[in-house]
Amino acid sequence: MKKAIVFLANGFEEMEALGTVDILRRGGIEVTTVSITANPVVTGAHNVPVTADTTLEKVNLADADALVLPGGMPG
């Protein structure tokens, strides 16, 4: 099974990140959401808190076939 990592940073665009996660999972891709900080709870651009599957310090990037970087502010 193919694997993708979706990175989440505070201020991420919820629709870009979570819409992408949804579509990839529907397509049979194993998706892991990753907070770029030590805190797994990340707040999106519209103040929606999302709990990532894991954090950057715990993930092995070499396991992924694709890396997804959603947009957002502050950038």
Task: Place the predicted regions along the sequence by residue.
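Extended, subdomain-level signal for the structured scaffold at the beginning of enzyme domains
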Residues: M1-G75
